[in-house]
Amino acid sequence: RNWGVPIPSYTCADCGEKVMNDATLDAVIKLFHEKGSDAWFTDAPESYLGESCVCPKCGGHHLKADKDILDVWWDSGVSWKAVCEYRPELEYPADVYLEGSDQHRGWFQSSLLTSVGANGHAPYKAVVSQGFTLDGQGRKMSKSLGNVIDPNKVCDEMGADIIRLWVASVDTSSDVSIDHEILARTSDAYRRFRNTLRFLLSELEGQFEPETDGVAFVDLLPLDKLMVARLTQVQAEVDDAYASYEFPRAYRALYDFVVTELSNVYLDALKDRLYCDKPGSLERRSAQTVLAELFSMLMRDLQPILSYTVDEAMAYAPAGCVDHQKYAALLDWYKSPITVDEANEFEGVLEASLELRSAVTKALEDARSAGTFTCLLYTSPSPRDA
């Protein structure tokens, strides 16, 4: 090999003895500091070894630099030393090492062995290993099969956030499949997140500022208190998932919350208050206070996944929802107005409320199917309102 980090040993041209000692090593260190490791292959040993250019066995002065190099896994395996320890803006151990599953016996292992051998501990706090990308049928992608998915083309057609959302939704610790059908399903999930953000903004932008219009938790309407309790529980799940690098779990918690609990239940139940109650009334401000909390939560939780979408939403957000920041990446993690323990105290009421809603909804559906359900709506505006 004519590249790589050389093993700094020499061979005596006169007797074949291998030569490597403190004097030669000091000379090589000085050479590398001045010219870099490539000088090993370009400079004659006698030009930098000086008096140490001598064979201890036969006394000859004709030393030839050996061409062997260190294993490339040794090179990368000491990056914690060459990079993390020497650069003041970095930390050692590193927060996380991220690589493919083929590095279990490569970089991950060589880094672990060298760091433990030198310092007695791992060079990383966590390891995140990813599998390989296969087509929808689980086959390796190849041009001959015509099953290659070009991420640049997907970005052009669907947007980068679709790829980011797909990556977050699958278990990348093992091999994952992708094709146009899978991306279409991902695109549908993306629209659900985006539409939820749009709805929240439609009830907040230019109408509500949490810092001046917000309602304290103790004064919220009962339904709104239940939603704050629920979002607090979901946030705890998302925090734990992100801390464990379990991105699919974070995605699933957010997706289920948005689709099942927000769109299908809570946001639907708020529409009477949001559309009919007087602006500035407690009933409406109570609802908007929770919408602002939901928006603040989703901005922060979705930022690692839907970076571009969240930045787009930031442009229309009330300043108090986004800490007066311009970019979502600068936001701190979401903090609920109540603790998880306080939220858990509402668990029984929340379950009973959902069971009651389910029973009422079923009764209404049965009555509608039987043709016995009638709904009459009367409006009677006062002269002042008219």
Residue ranges and their predicted role:
Residues R1-E205, M227-L270, V290-R300:
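Structured secondary-structure scaffolds
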Residues D26-E34, S47, Q325, G348, ...:
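Polar/charged alpha-helical tracts
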Residues L63, Q207-A236, L267-A363, A370-G371, ...:
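Acidic, turn-prone loop/beta-hairpin segments
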Residues P381-D385:
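A short, hydrophobic C-terminal helix/tail in secreted or cell-surface proteins
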